[in-house]
């Protein structure tokens, strides 16, 4: 079976990392966390600068290429659309995954604005360089910062508002199994 790239995307605060970690535990797929790449690149270049944008996208693409080459069964990549991502990134990712006979599956997480703003201030977001300022989020949102790049239609949309993250991860895992992907089920430890 081809390497499955589960592209878990949504606005800041919808629960991508939490759901991604739980989905990884359930499926056995590796997790490529957006901020692992972003934090590395911001240690070298200012966020949004041309070298930052170029290196971040190169690392994302090279990481996915390496997983496909290594015949990993699956990779969960978390992603937040935002204005410093080039419009070419998603089409380039699709072409590269397809050329290597991988499968790219877009799964969107959503959350209502009130809960999203509550989540943004969570202490756990400080572990990575995640957006935690509600006023900054509102301004960025008003300015359209999260409206690009244009995302393809998701094959599954999960509303995480008021939903336990484990339930969200299980919805995704069950969707993948029903689609014939059949990731392994998490083994319970004794």
Segments and roles (model prediction):
Residues 60, 64, 165-176:
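Short, amphipathic alpha-helical "lid/cap" segments that border enzyme active or binding sites
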Residues 98-121, 158:
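Conserved phosphate-donor/acceptor-positioning beta-strand/loop module used by diverse small-molecule
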Residues 118, 122-171, 182-185, 190:
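Small-molecule kinase domains that catalyze NTP-dependent phosphoryl transfer to phosphate-bearing small molecules
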Residues 15:
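Conserved glycine(s) of the Walker
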Residues 11:
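P-loop (Walker A) phosphate-binding loop of NTP-binding proteins
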Residues 18-68:
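Conserved substrate/cofactor phosphate-moiety recognition/catalytic segment
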Residues 8:
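Hydrophobic anchor at the beta1->P-loop junction of P-loop NTPases
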């Amino acid at each position: 079976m081809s390497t499955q790239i589960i592209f878990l995307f949504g606005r800041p605060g919808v629960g991508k990392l939490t759901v991604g970690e739980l989905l990884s535990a359930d499926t056995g797929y590796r997790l490529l966390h957006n901020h692992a790449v972003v934090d590395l690149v911001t240690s070298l270049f200012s966020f949004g600068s041309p070298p930052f944008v170029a290196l971040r996208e190169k690392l994302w693409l090279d990481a996915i290429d390496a997983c496909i080459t290594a015949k990993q069964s699956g990779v969960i990549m978390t992603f937040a659309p935002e204005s410093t991502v080039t419009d070419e990134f998603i089409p380039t990712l699709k072409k590269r995954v397809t050329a290597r006979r991988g499968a790219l599956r877009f799964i969107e997480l959503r959350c209502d604005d009130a809960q999203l703003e509550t989540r943004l201030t969570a202490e756990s977001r400080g572990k990575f360089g995640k957006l935690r300022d509600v006023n900054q989020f509102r301004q960025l949102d008003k300015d359209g910062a999260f409206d690009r790049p244009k995302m393809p239609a998701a094959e599954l949309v999960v509303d995480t508002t008021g939903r336990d993250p484990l339930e969200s991860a299980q919805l995704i895992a069950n969707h993948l199994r029903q689609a014939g992907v059949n990731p392994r089920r998490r083994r319970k430890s004794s």
